[in-house]
Amino acid sequence: MKKIQYFTIITDTREQKPYTFQNIKPEPPAVIRQGLKTGDYSVVGLESKITIERKSLSDLFGSAGKGRKRLESEFQRMNKFDYAAILIESSLSDIFVNPPGRSKMNPKAVFRTLISWSVKYNVCVWPCWSRDAAERVCYLILNNYYNNYYNLKG
């Protein structure tokens, strides 16, 4: 059995509300702040292999509306990674039932954009029911990718 290796998470320096990963058990991972060309989170040594972008519900609606070209460019850049994901700090039902109050975007249009671009650019979209859940999912994705990449555990 191979010894479990610990990894270091990179948080992009532009990330305004970074995850701390302090509630991860049994031990929080090491985290550093470093500029990433794409995404908000990656793993030291695997920056060109895996990327994760975090979006709050209001970020998502803003990006799908006025920031549409920038959002599609982000999907295009993410397509170059072995694994790329967008984590939404909200449930799928919230996209439809509780869209941001000031948004003029049709929730169906936002949802269809996510589906269309996730397929076109091979980017996973993970709606999570809360910010805490999204932080946990972010950790689990990075941890699983790291372990699979280095063949550390089955």
Language-model features: locations:
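Conserved catalytic cores of phosphodiester-cleaving nucleases, focusing on short active-site segments
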Residues: I50-S56
